Structures are given as C-alpha cells and as structure tokens.
C-alpha cells in the first residue's frame, strides 16, 4: 500500500467488483423473451475481417474460411473440426452474438452441430481456452462463463426440445469427451 497506493486502490476495487459479481451471479436467472438475432450478424462483420487471421480451405464451416482469435489453439481446433467425421457444420460465432451478463456481455466462440447418433449432444456451443484452470482465467471472464452456463440451462429447460450443450474446452479431444458423455 505505501509503495504504490494507486495500484492498491485499483486492485482492491477490482477484487470488490469481482466479489460483488459473484454474489449477483449466484441469484442470476435468465427469462426468455421474444427477441431473436437477425441473420445479418453473420454477414455484417465479413466486410471488415482481418484476413491475416483467417484459415482458408475449410469445408464444414459456414464460410470457406474461418477468422480465428489465436493462431495456436483455435487454428488447431478448426483443423480438427473440419476433418472430423462427427461434425456436420460449425461456425465461429460473430462478435454481435452476445449473452448479457451482470459483468458485461459475453461472446462464446463456436456453434457446432454433430451428426445425429454419433454423440450424445448434437448441438454444442463452445468456448475455447488455452487452460481450464479458473485461477488462470481472469475473474470477470470466469464470471461470464458462469453466466453462460445458466443461460444455456434456461434455454434447454424452457425454449428448445433439442438440447444445446455449452462448455469450455481446451481442445477437440476435450470437446468430444464432453459431447459423448
């Protein structure tokens, strides 16, 4: 505190906000509305895409290329999705696809549809991370993931007869463990 009071105050403020968010999220519930996403969210960003991060020559993505956030994990994930016999189609969710949370909007990474009969969960929303350790995920990001779990639980309970599974995965093999279980 004495050496850097500004840093101390900023860190204390961050910790208080994280704890406040945890308390709010414990009581959080989502209620369905009649709103829907316009299909334009999948095409609006295509005009301003950074093609240096694109993986081209893909067959099962909704486009013939995928723009990835990271060159390691997501690029490998795309390669495995595209060559998998179980995957029918997948999409990198656009930045406009947002789940509202008390700590800010959350944008999951992937929507994946699997071949019926090949896995237990046919429809899957995935967040790809380099690590599963909640200690290594930023506090706010971890809270958003917690909210997304509640969001998809509500969708499954009240809106759709088709079960939409959501989880955080570190690789394609981890994804297959989750959807097969």
Labelled PLM ranges:
Residues 1-106, 113-181:
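Intrinsically disordered, low-complexity, repeat-rich regions
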